[in-house]
Amino acid sequence: MWRDTPGAMWRDTPGVRWRLAAPRPVDDPALFLTRLRAEAQGAPVALGLDLPLGVPRAYAARRPEAGFLPFLDTIRAWPDFFRVCAAVPEIHPERPFYPARGIKGMTRAAHAAALGFAGAGDLSRLCDRATPERPAGAPLFWTLGANQSGKAAIAAWRDMLLPALARERSLVRLWPFEGRFRALLAPGTVTLAETYPAEASRHLGLRLRGSKRRQSDRAAAAPALLAAMARLNVAPEPALVLAVTDGLGSDAAGEDRFDCLLGVLCVINVLEGHRPDGTPDDPWLTSWEGWVLGQTAVPETVARSGRRPAR
């Protein structure tokens, strides 16, 4: 979850390449990336975000922009883009998020039809779809349910990403739209990449028994998490070891802290060269849809749009 982030810092120490701090809340989202760059003292910052970075190709096919990055510039002038629709008649391309609350007759098929899509499957990006290794993620524009990601995208894009891009565009880089992940890392910059906890746990060889919403089940995963850190030459701070052993807290934010930890380990896993830092060979991914960092499994069923994106 982008609102809580564990800090990882590279260290050239024998047997230790990374030191990992416990997750902490983000204070001012608009200045979050600036603060990370300041704390890095000129070193490159790599940041994994558990939320969508990109839009589905069925939506993108109707846009005049060349890709997701210029699209972000466009929506800055759309006052209602982030206002979630309460009813289907309110849905249109400049106000695509739905629904504001659960109501009778609410379906993803109706949502898709209101956006001019052929079916509910068009709401999903390729990386949202189920693979042989994990279940499907939720579509970007859908905002209801425990598994939805729309509200996180709204908060992060509106309150963190757009302000940062407006203030310091040359210092903020988005993967995979601007290149391979490791190649984007440069002194004084911050590079953002989408991560997905269900994907990251498989990259790290973790098999959570039970539910990550339960503290006891998260605590039971502590030995595997600490072992994954050791394999990656990560030295967790004592406070983090205690938190992981305790299941990352008894409050509702414990699940978010758990996902944060998976996300930062996913990023380190890629930086260490254990997972690829690119995408499958599909121009939609690097222009509009984005991809999940480190993912190699590709869904068998792919929704095809009517035109190819601009290269």
Segments and roles (model prediction):
Residues 1-10, 15-46, 51-311:
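RNase H-like (RuvC/DEDD) metal-dependent nuclease/polynucleotide-processing core
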